[in-house]
Amino acid sequence: QRALLFDIGGGSTELAWVRLDGGVPTLMGFESLPMGVVTLAERFAHVAYSPFGFHAMVDDIVEKLLPFERIHRIAHEIRRGGVHLLGTSGTVTTLAGVVLGLSRYRRPLVDGIVLSGEDADQALRLLRDLGKDGLHRHPCVGPERADFVLPGCAVFAAIRSLWPAEHVVVADRGLREGMLLRMMRTTSPKPSRGGMSRE
């Protein structure tokens, strides 16, 4: 089994490509890219809320992810099966909150949840379609985080476009805070706790 771990931060996005054969995790590749929700929000501030601006962000991020894909051929491994996608960041926890239909963020419900790729993509589209005012009002976002949600969603969309794993494991903690242990314990996907929110 293999796992692609990603952490979308404020100023960077970290990727770790890990082999889990035999229960002992082996790091096969690691990359820290100088792009995060804050830096992307600054670069695309005037266009991030438009469809054109969002797709421009995604295209820009995909170009930066491609060297990692060319080296490790992760998409090929995903097609063969046995690859887990595990993410941590305000972006993926927000997507999980949307899928669960939470009226406020609750870490115990979000941490460790396994989302189907379809649910995660649908939650992303919902957030993208809300617009600035809708993101300000959404209980899982709020005014303090609204400007950073779509840049984070753009990173997630770029990751999903290159590496469309069947499920996404969500962790409310960093790459260095036990994610490998969580990944090793995730032997098979469990259904997400709840359906898509239609708020």
Give names to the regions the model predicted.
Residues 7:
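Conserved catalytic-loop position in the HRD/HxD motif
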Residues 11-14:
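Acidic, divalent-metal-coordinating active-site segment for phosphoryl/phosphodiester hydrolysis
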Residues 1-3, 17-20, 24-199:
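Helical "lid/coupling" subdomains associated with nucleotide-phosphate turnover
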